[in-house]
Amino acid sequence: ALIDRVIGVKCAVSDHRSSAPHDAALANMAAQSRVGGLLGNKAGISVFHMGSSKKGLAPLYAILENSDVPMSKLLPTHVNRSESLFDAAIEFALKGGHIDITSGIPGPVTPSQAVKRAVDSGVALDLLSVSSDGNGSQPVFDAQGNLTGIGVAGFESLLETLVALVQVQNMPLADALVPFTRSVAKFLG
């Protein structure tokens, strides 16, 4: 609440690169972010970098079970990195949770396919956002899972995803813009 530009927290879960936080620690983190947001008149959100672990969104459901943090303050991102995670994310959104699709993830669920599939499954556009993970680290692993390098994610995939939504998925431009603009603004308050 004291640092002007800080509007919440971000933590990696369900990922081999996370610090493997326990459910109670995650619930406490999300609750502190929520309270800080209330005190500082900010969003007080908790963003979760989702990995490919079979745990999927279980850590977020544990937060909801072990705290009083509203679902509207939790944001799983990178949900299109695997089919099983994306299916779980659609369920999360159908229950009222906001989900974030990463434009820089080429598959297995492309960003434009992810938006289209979510909408076709009944997810409201206002519960979807698309982000680039721009300036985030992009680790490179070999076939054995060894880190071989680290790059930096760019922003160009945002425009590419918007174009694909309109030209490939045949979504009207006004609707295609929502996950990049209005839904993000609403989520961040």
Residue ranges and their predicted role:
Residues 1-2, 28, 189:
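Proteins with a high burden of low-complexity, intrinsically disordered sequence enriched in S/T/G/P/A and R
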Residues 1-19:
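Metal-cofactor-binding active-site regions of metalloenzymes
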Residues 120-189:
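His/Asp/Glu-enriched, well-ordered alpha-helical/loop segment
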